[in-house]
Amino acid sequence: HPLLKIANHSLIDLPTPSNISAWWNFGSLLGLCLVIQILTGLFLAMHYTSDTLTAFSSVTHICRDVNYGWLIRYLHANGASMFFICLYMHVGRGIYYGSYTYLETWNIGIILLFAVMATAFMGYVLPWGQMSFWGATVITNLLSAIPYIGTTLVEWIWGGFSVDKATLTRFFAFHFILPFIIAALVMVHLLFLHETGSNNPSGIPSNSDKIPFHPYYTIKDALGFLVLILLLLLLVLFSPDLLGDPDNYTPANPLNTPPHIKPEWYFLFAYAILRSIPNKLGGVLALIMSILVLAIIPFLHISKQRSMMFRPISQVLFWVLVADLLTLTWIGGQPVEHPFITIGQVASILYFSIILILMPLASLIENKILKW
């Protein structure tokens, strides 16, 4: 049967490298996150209303009156956090082990990253709290930095002259449909991956040593699922508001700006890069480039080795990059004052320098050391 054949060749008889580590678990974990988000989101949508007058109340109603509504709501909110943790780990794995040399798979991955970020942003607007409203206002307003068409574009997206009813309704519509587009893209992502098969930690072709996906990696994925669900439940049942902003428990008020407008933690690194450039258009470009720079990475790969496993200089740079991203995440949540401004600017410059200049340079040195 053709459908069973696809399932069999993707999940059961798939030849898989025998030495892939836990860093290869995040793909399936992202799949699990997507399923959790679609299911919890579907049940939330059954009780949510996307009108400015009732949106905030409908979320309160879900938490207070719907059976296990509080659980569904917090699973969905914190599920997004787990989604991004897995996403960043997955991308980091790709950079470390040179998986980006699978160009089609990598590029669809970048499109997926953008799609998930767009979905999360629009989802954050839906509860219609203070941070929802002002986050939507600030981020959509960035498009006005586009020369000539900017202002028209922003008003077109808003459906008026400010973030209002029309904006909320369309954001709900987009937030509902995007996850299904993401699911379709995931299939394409996997289709391209299965053309080549998985990479492995050594970066050396493993065609001579493949094992069937089932039972070896089905059981390994199942363990990953259990760990993810455990962590998600710990978050949801013990401190569901740990990662949220208390301002979002205040209903949206266009006449009152919150003291610190900031996105959810998973966007803070990009927000810090955006703010560290004292020019609107420049900031927007830096913001887009902070993710789009991933598309350039494959073309800067000049090392004779694929993986960083045996490249100590590149390894150090990689972990400095991780530390730098954590620094940017911290700065994104701080007010725009001394010394945070300078730290943010240094961290932003370092971010692009490591990826575009220092890593290729390190590869060059490593090639020389190995007399290649």
Swiss-Prot record:
Heme 1 (or BL or b562) is low-potential and absorbs at about 562 nm, and heme 2 (or BH or b566) is high-potential and absorbs at about 566 nm. The chain crosses the membrane at residues 26-46, 70-91, 106-126, 171-191, 219-239, 281-301, 313-333, 340-360. This is Cytochrome b. It comes from Sylvilagus transitionalis. The cytochrome bc1 complex contains 11 subunits: 3 respiratory subunits (MT-CYB, CYC1 and UQCRFS1), 2 core proteins (UQCRC1 and UQCRC2) and 6 low-molecular weight proteins (UQCRH/QCR6, UQCRB/QCR7, UQCRQ/QCR8, UQCR10/QCR9, UQCR11/QCR10 and a cleavage product of UQCRFS1). This cytochrome bc1 complex then forms a dimer. Its main location: mitochondrion. The lineage of its organism: Eukaryota, Metazoa, Chordata, Craniata, Vertebrata. PANTHER family: CYTOCHROME B. It comes from the Eukaryota. Gene3D superfamilies: Cytochrome Bc1 Complex, Chain C. A ubiquinone binds at residue 194. Belongs to the cytochrome b family. InterPro entries: Cyt_b/b6_C (IPR005798), Cyt_b/b6_C_sf (IPR036150), Cyt_b/b6_N (IPR005797), Cytb/b6-like_sf (IPR027387), Cytochrome_b (IPR030689), Cytochrome_b_C_euk/bac (IPR048260), Cytochrome_b_N_euk/bac (IPR048259), Di-haem_cyt_TM (IPR016174).
